[in-house]
Amino acid sequence: MGCLLFLLLWALLQAWGSAEVPQRLFPLRCLQISSFANSSWTRTDGLAWLGELQTHSWSNDSDTVRSLKPWSQGTFSDQQWETLQHIFRVYRSSFTRDVKEFAKMLRLSYPLELQVSAGCEVHPGNASNNFFHVAFQGKDILSFQGTSWEPTQEAPLWVNLAIQVLNQDKWTRETVQWLLNGTCPQFVSGLLESGKSELEKQVKPKAWLSRGPSPGPGRLLLVCHVSGFYPKPVWVKWMRGEQEQQDTQPGDILPNADETWYLRATLDVAAGEAAGLSCRVKHSSLEGQDIILYWGGSYTSVGLIVLAVLACLLFLLIVGFTSRFKRQTSYQGVL
């Protein structure tokens, strides 16, 4: 009986432990791409992501930031939102002008490509961190740190001259500080409140197996497809029993059109070693009921196995207690 109680406790711990979901954070990341074909032709486009969801876009042909979600304005009033958009319009105009002036002063050759990544992340307890990075021709050259602009270690020498000029502009530096330290965390907090249901949604993955192109004579490429899951973090491994196959090659996690994700994991094995292999999928939406697909077509779920074990253990406990009670009753009758 003690052994049965131990097994029951173990099964419960397995079920509870596998259902733990780490706390998620949702950084706001604003991305900007600016192209300068020459001194007279320029284009700047932008978009913003909150965690894994795209929330805003800004076309070069528009003066208005487009909201892609019903809750994209967060808890900002219409006046606050319009003020923020006005700041962005001034920023885009100033950015274009300044780049042209720097190109002339530093004798940079067209075409020019600049990328900007800026935003913030709000943590529990209202703590936050922020970032503002600038890349030139695809390579990071400078960032905003605290109260001023600083070059990266790999930045060209001319970046130091540009930073000297930028740091002399006190109004711009103070505006950047205000946006990063105050406005951004406030805006993100409002987005998290307004978009809570969509941000915290859980969509279960679907998984299937296939055979990929042969890696060579006598070998198989086993492919495990996992699609339609949200949020993005997922764990996929080829297994032999409970042993992870370290040669599993996961691909990139790619977006689907419906804002869910797709991943495939491959394993190159000898044809005679494919039997007994399985693909295991862990995701927060499964609540501990991992998907296991066996090479050869069978399917099972760890959660169902745990439930079956629990049911059997409970049945054995009931039978054991009932049998013991009957024996005690019969002994009392004899006495």
UniProtKB/Swiss-Prot annotation:
Spans within the Cytoplasmic topological domain: 323-335
Residues at which a D-galactosylceramide binds: 98, 169-172
Transmembrane segments: 302-322
Major localization listed first in the record, in broad terms: membrane
Subcellular location as annotated: Cell membrane; Basolateral cell membrane; Endosome membrane; Lysosome membrane
InterPro entries in UniProt: Ig-like_dom (IPR007110), Ig-like_dom_sf (IPR036179), Ig-like_fold (IPR013783), Ig_C1-set (IPR003597), MHC_class-I_related (IPR050208), MHC_I-like_Ag-recog (IPR011161), MHC_I-like_Ag-recog_sf (IPR037055), MHC_I/II-like_Ag-recog (IPR011162)
Swiss-Prot/TrEMBL GO biological process terms: antigen processing and presentation, endogenous lipid antigen via MHC class Ib; antigen processing and presentation, exogenous lipid antigen via MHC class Ib; immune response; innate immune response; positive regulation of T cell mediated cytotoxicity
UniProt keyword Transferase present: no
Matching Gene3D superfamilies: Immunoglobulins (2.60.40.10), MHC class I-like antigen recognition-like (3.30.500.10)
SUPFAM superfamilies: Immunoglobulin (SSF48726), MHC antigen-recognition domain (SSF54452)
Bilayer topology: Single-pass type I membrane protein
Positions glycosylated per UniProt: 38, 60, 126, 181
Gene Ontology CC terms: basolateral plasma membrane; endoplasmic reticulum membrane; endosome membrane; external side of plasma membrane; extracellular space; lysosomal membrane; lysosome
Membrane-side (Extracellular) residue stretches: 20-301
Motif (Internalization signal): 331-334
Keyword Aminoacyl-tRNA synthetase part of the UniProt annotation: no
Role this protein plays: Antigen-presenting protein that binds self and non-self glycolipids and presents them to T-cell receptors on natural killer T-cells.
Quaternary structure and interacting proteins, as annotated: Heterodimer with B2M (beta-2-microglobulin). Interacts with MHC II.
Protein name: Antigen-presenting glycoprotein CD1d
Lineage, broadest ranks: Eukaryota, Metazoa, Chordata, Craniata, Vertebrata
Gene name tied to this protein: CD1D
